[in-house]
Structure formats: structure tokens, C-alpha cells
A protein has these predicted regions:
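Repeat-blade elements of multi-bladed beta-propeller folds
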Residues: 7-17, 40-62, 80-114, 127-155, ...
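A short beta-strand motif characteristic of beta-propeller blades
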Residues: 33-37, 71-76, 122-128, 163-168, ...
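Juxtamembrane cytosolic interface motif at the C-terminal end of transmembrane helices
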Residues: 406-416
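Short loop/turn segments immediately following beta-strands, especially the blade-tip
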Residues: 369-380
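Blade/loop signatures of beta-propeller domains
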Residues: 5-34
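Hydrophobic secretory-pathway targeting helix
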Residues: 1-3
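Cytoplasmic C-terminal tails of single-pass
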Residues: 416-436
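Short loop/turn segments that connect beta-strands within beta-propeller blades
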Residues: 66-70, 117-121, 158-162, 203-206, ...
Length: 436
């Protein structure tokens, strides 16, 4: 039985504060494009899905996109600044949308967290001032919003009042969305100048530092953390997946993959499933308890901004060449893939009827896929997996080819090496008999 999130809404990055990346009743492949929503200008953030809309942040507005049609349902004006993923939390009977807005540039920039009541579509005062710009997304849990900035700060903000609960200072940039699980907040700060990456475990209530993890020799690259059931998982630039104890940060296991990880990508982690993807295009299913590799699929296309998600029993991932790919969770076979087209596929949100992802380019767009009952499923192994039947067939072909290339010319050469009067052996017999 696969672990599932408690709602069919995809309210934040990877669907839940711990980043499980799982929707048990999501649509199955094959897929067809249901609609495309193009930004009026600039890029778009990865979407969240709440009720009947997908919500995405644009350069100067936040858009609500109708899931049924792909048309614009509403928009909220935004001043500008870096585009980061929004989130939706629940306070009482209200759904509160939170996103980041920035006015001004450089030292004069004024970055704030904005709260909007989705029931009334009214902004809630006051805005919460932040110390720096926030390139990553927002996690919501227990009535609070958690986010980081590019100066290493992690914040907790009360969703109901906008009050800044606490600020924790780290070294480097918090590029990804913090993970929240069992009263702890996990944030990764990548410090390029010092060449180190640090995972901070913070008390969700006070922001006090509980422990830190800084793997030796890993450099300044660490993926977005995922956490559940006392386990925290990150990938590092030394090609290792690390599983840590949520209690004290001690390492439970590590597992080697083929390459390093994107600092804005996360794993999909639940009690019985762990899916990770590396930057150059490898997807791996690992055992959460031991780190043993169950299968891998080498897509050989960059995965700069997407994270694996699980829709039912299908693993979905977006690629740099514009494809969405679907891989069967149990077999590790590729069962469906979209067409290559310009613009990478970034972070993915899943609803019971649709898969929605952000697509890069200028302007950016959201693309939604639906189940296509007339489509065809594939059954393609990773190009790194050897098919025994094919291997035997290729070996047989190689033997025949070797015979043709080596033996036949040798026979021809041997015949040409005989005396010019070719039938000598037959002619010489009588002569030899005479000599005898």
C-alpha cells in the first residue's frame, strides 16, 4: 500500500510540507495535452492545485487557471521580483494563499510575504517584510508558512496574522523549499563561496537549531530535503543520497548514484517509496529503509528543475527537452513519453484528473495532461539495461559477422596463394608416382 497525502489538493511544492510528491488517485498514462495556459508576459512559477484552479506566480500577477478549460479564472496584481512557487494553507475554514512580492531592486528592494483569502480574494494585512529575495517556494504546515531567502535566512510566518514568528540565519543561499515534518523544519543552504552545503534542522515553533549536517567533500551542492517518519533525505554533489535520522542528524545510510543533483529539485519520499533524480537525467527508486537501489532509468536528458512525483503507480518527471515522461513504479519501465519541444518541464502538480506542470520559455506556460484512453502505452527499458534475448541475438550476429569478415577473406586469400597453375596437386600425382 502506497502512502498518500491526506488531500487531493496539491497545495505546495511536492504536494505536502514533507515533500512526499505522491497522489494515490492521480491520472494514469497514456496522456494527452488537455490545455496550455501561456503567461501574458515573462515566466511562470510551478503551480499549486486547489479546488478547481491551478495557481501560478507570474512576473507582475498571480494567476488562477481554470482546471476544466485552461482559461484564466482570476488574477492578483504583483509588483515584481524573482518568481517563486506559492502555497495554500488552511486557517479555520479559510484557505490562505501565500506568495512573495518584491518592489524595487538591489539594496532598495522590499521583499514581502503576501497573504490572500481565497474565499473573498482579498489581500490580508499586513504584509510580512523579509530580509532578502526568496528564490525557493513556500511550505505551509500547522498554521504557519516557512520559506528561505538568498542570504541564508529561514522564516516562519503566522498564516492568520502575518506575524513573523522567527528568523533563523544560515550560511549560503536557501534556494529550495524547506521541508516540514514532526515539528521540525529542514532547510538547505548552499554556500558557493565557502564550497559547502549545510542542512539545518530547526524547531518549527521557535526556530532554534536542533542539529546541522554538512557532508565532508560534498561541495556546495545539496538538493531540496524531504522528510517523513523520522527520516530526512538529501542528495549531494558527490553523487550520494544521504538518509538521516530526524532526531539528531546521524546518517542511517548513503546510496551512490551516477551524478550530482539540482539544488532546486527534491525527492519523492513516503514510508515505502523513495524516488530521486540526478541532474544529468537519471531516475532512481531506492528502498527508504536501506538505500538499496531497486531500479534506475537513465533518460540521458538534463533534469534541471523537475522533481519526481508519483501519480497512482506511475512516476512522472519533466525533462529539459520539453518532455513529460512516465515510468512504472514496479517495473522501472518507461510506459509513456510526450513529444520533444522547446522549453523545459519543471515542477509538477497532480490532481485526480490532471497532471499540471510549468514549462520554461518566454513567455512561460502551464501545461495540463489528462488520461487518454485511446493512447498507446510503451514498455521501454532503460538504455543501460541489457536485454538477455537481445544480447544473445547480438552475440550470434557478431559471430556470423566475424566469420564473414575474417574466415571468408582468409579462404579467398589462401586460394590466391596457391601456384599459378592451380590444378597442380592433381597433375603432380602422376609425376610423383613416376619418380617413385
Amino acid at each position: 500500500m502506497l502512502a498518500q497525502t491526506g488531500t487531493t489538493d496539491w497545495e505546495q511544492f511536492q504536494g505536502d510540507p514533507g515533500h512526499p510528491g505522491t497522489l494515490g488517485d492521480g491520472p494514469a498514462p497514456p496522456y494527452a495535452v488537455a490545455w496550455t495556459f501561456k503567461a501574458p508576459e515573462g515566466a511562470l512559477s510551478a503551480p499549486v492545485v486547489v479546488g478547481d484552479v491551478a495557481i501560478t506566480v507570474g512576473e507582475h500577477a498571480v494567476y488562477g487557471v481554470d482546471l476544466a478549460t485552461g482559461g484564466q479564472a482570476w488574477q492578483l496584481i504583483r509588483n515584481g521580483g524573482p518568481i517563486s512557487m506559492p502555497a495554500v494553507g488552511i486557517v479555520g475554514d479559510r484557505r490562505i494563499l501565500v506568495f512573495v512580492d518584491t518592489a524595487g531592486t538591489g539594496k532598495e528592494a522590499n521583499t514581502t510575504l503576501v497573504r490572500v483569502d481565497l474565499g473573498t480574494m482579498k489581500e490580508l494585512a499586513p504584509r510580512t517584510p523579509l530580509l532578502a529575495t526568496t528564490p525557493g517556494g513556500i511550505a505551509v504546515d500547522g498554521g504557519n508558512a516557512y520559506l528561505g531567502d538568498d542570504e541564508g535566512n529561514t522564516y516562519a510566518v503566522d498564516l492568520a496574522t502575518g506575524t513573523l514568528g522567527w528568523t533563523a540565519k544560515g550560511s549560503g543561499e536557501v534556494l529550495g523549499t524547506p521541508a516540514v515534518s514532526d515539528g521540525r523544519v529542514y532547510a538547505v543552504a548552499n554556500d558557493v563561496e565557502q564550497g559547502v552545503a549545510t542542512l539545518y534542522a530547526l524547531d518549527a515553533g521557535s526556530g532554534s537549531e536542533m542539529w546541522t549536517y554538512q557532508p565532508k567533500g560534498a561541495g556546495a551542492g545539496m538538493s531540496v530535503p524531504a522528510a517523513t517518519g523520522g527520516l530526512v533525505v538529501v542528495g549531494t554533489s558527490d553523487r550520494l543520497v544521504h538518509a538521516l535520522s530526524a532526531d539528531d542528524g546521524t546518517e542511517r545510510w548513503q546510496s551512490l548514484v551516477l551524478s550530482a543533483f539540482s539544488p532546486v529539485s527534491s525527492s519523492a519520499l513516503s514510508s515505502d517509496v523513495l524516488l530521486v533524480s540526478d541532474y544529468p537525467g537519471g531516475l532512481y527508486r531506492l528502498d527508504p529503509g536501506t538505500g538499496a537501489r531497486l531500479w534506475d532509468y537513465q533518460l540521458n536528458v538534463l533534469i534541471p528543475r523537475s522533481s519526481p512525483v508519483l501519480s497512482g503507480s506511475t512516476v512522472l518527471l519533466g525533462l529539459n527537452d520539453g518532455r513529460l515522461v512516465a515510468i512504472d513504479l514496479d517495473s522501472g519501465l518507461l510506459v509513456w513519453q510526450g513529444e520533444e519541444n522547446p522549453g523545459l518541464i519543471g515542477a509538477i502538480a497532480v490532481s485526480p484528473e490532471l497532471v499540471v506542470a510549468v514549462k520554461g520559455g518566454m513567455p512561460g506556460s502551464l501545461v495540463a495532461w489528462k488520461h487518454d484512453p485511446t493512447g498507446k502505452l510503451l514498455s521501454l527499458p532503460s538504455p543501460t539495461v541489457v536485454d538477455p534475448a537481445m544480447l544473445f541475438g547480438n552475440a550470434a550476429i557478431a559471430v556470423v559477422a566475424t566469420f564473414v569478415v575474417l574466415f571468408v577473406p582468409f579462404r579467398l586469400l589462401a586460394s590466391r596463394a596457391r601456384p599459378a597453375f592451380g590444378d597442380d596437386e592433381d597433375a603432380a600425382g602422376p609425376e610423383e608416382e613416376e619418380e617413385a
